[in-house]
Amino acid sequence: MALPSWLESLKAAQKTCILQDGRRKVHYLFSDGKEMAEEYDAKSHELLVRKWRQKSALGAYGQWQIEVGDPPLPVAGTIQSDFLKESSSNPTFTRKDTKSSFQWRIRNLPYAKEVYSVTVDKKDRCCIIRTTNKKYYKKFSIPDLDRCQLDLNENALSFAHANNTLIVTYQKPKEILSLEEELQRELKSLKTTNEGDVECKTQ
């Protein structure tokens, strides 16, 4: 999906907007039945959460797939919760963007910065994190670039390491920045319902 058609899809989607807990929460329903939910900081307008879900062949909703933001905490007392508690020292991979860049944080990586390398694989359209001690390896794509059919640029990629956390940054290309500005204008034109109000307006 090229950049103009992705922007048009966003504009054409049915949208509901609510202001809650200092966040502007936007729900999108696309013509193909997919749903996207985003949460923005109400003051800075920075994206905090983006997640997707779609119906199965039987019409049941699947689980939300997190694209940006921390995964939801498991319910206390469940098997999953106990399992996560045991493996809390394992690396955790989350995406948290800024206005000018896509950013990923991998916690629980204690090695020195010199151990890591972060590269672009243009053929597979992904970024790859490697360590010289072979203790960590991760391939990940940038869905925003895929949706807009924009090429990956190695020069836009950088990384830092502090407090056992590897921070990988990819500078947003101008096409993405323009798209996000246009989307913010679109969202500002939506009627926003405050928390506690019953009705939300969908456009």
From Swiss-Prot:
One Pfam family here: DPCD
InterPro entries: DPCD (IPR026224)
Family: Belongs to the DPCD family.
Protein name as catalogued: Protein DPCD
Native organism taxonomy: Eukaryota, Metazoa, Chordata, Craniata, Vertebrata
Gene that this polypeptide is encoded by: dpcd
